[in-house]
């Protein structure tokens, strides 16, 4: 499941950034049942059923298990937060592809260390992957979400910009975060069973029937 042990500070050693390749479905499915590391936090976008852990270190492993804080030294208490994740063609709910469907005004919740934040989407647009100026630090009130605009290799990225809802009480934001996270978790569990486990079971049953048929010949 996509709920991690949440750290309370940055790790002393951050992995060296790796060249990131398009994700393979088998690697993502393997990672989804083998989550055994701590995360910096969790991002929840309820309108598109996205709930993913936030890791530090731009590596293939971290990107297969969730999302990555692109600039880990930028704490959302004093800086803009930038989160990047993969777009998976087979099912956008697996990782971060669902953010391309976020509409203006949509809610986004973030847990980062022990703090909770609520944001409202202000824009959702396509940029070139080289447009790093779009990710400039604008202070603590902004959140950037990034994914590829397709599941194949592409020079373009989806960039969602959201603004912090500063007037919401912390306890209300925390309660909303956990409520939406739990709802998405239940939905993802059902989706996983229907899309992956059920077809596998059908294949196994058909294989068994075929073997029995061959054995009786």
Question: Can you describe what each PLM-predicted range is?
Answer:
Residues 1-216:
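Solvent-exposed, non-transmembrane regions of membrane-associated and secreted proteins
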């Amino acid at each position: 499941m996509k709920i991690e042990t949440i750290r309370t500070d940055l790790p002393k050693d951050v992995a060296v950034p790796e060249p990131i390749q398009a994700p393979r479905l088998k690697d993502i499915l393997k990672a989804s049942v083998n989550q055994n590391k701590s995360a910096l936090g969790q991002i929840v976008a309820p309108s598109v059923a996205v709930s993913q852990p936030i890791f530090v270190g731009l590596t293939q492993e971290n990107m297969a298990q969730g999302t990555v804080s692109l600039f880990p030294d930028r704490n959302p208490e004093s800086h803009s937060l930038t989160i990047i994740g993969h777009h998976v063609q087979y099912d956008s709910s697996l990782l971060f592809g669902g953010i391309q469907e976020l509409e203006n005004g949509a809610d986004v919740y973030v847990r980062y260390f022990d703090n909770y934040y609520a944001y409202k989407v202000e824009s959702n647009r396509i940029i070139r992957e080289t447009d790093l100026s779009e990710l400039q630090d604008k202070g603590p009130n902004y959140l950037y979400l990034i994914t590829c605009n397709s599941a194949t290799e592409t020079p373009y990225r989806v960039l969602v910009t959201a603004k912090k809802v500063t007037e919401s009480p912390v306890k209300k934001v925390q309660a909303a975060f956990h409520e939406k996270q739990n709802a998405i978790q239940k939905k993802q569990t059902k989706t996983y069973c229907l899309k992956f486990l059920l077809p596998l079971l059908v294949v196994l049953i058909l294989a068994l029937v075929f073997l029995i048929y061959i054995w009786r010949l």
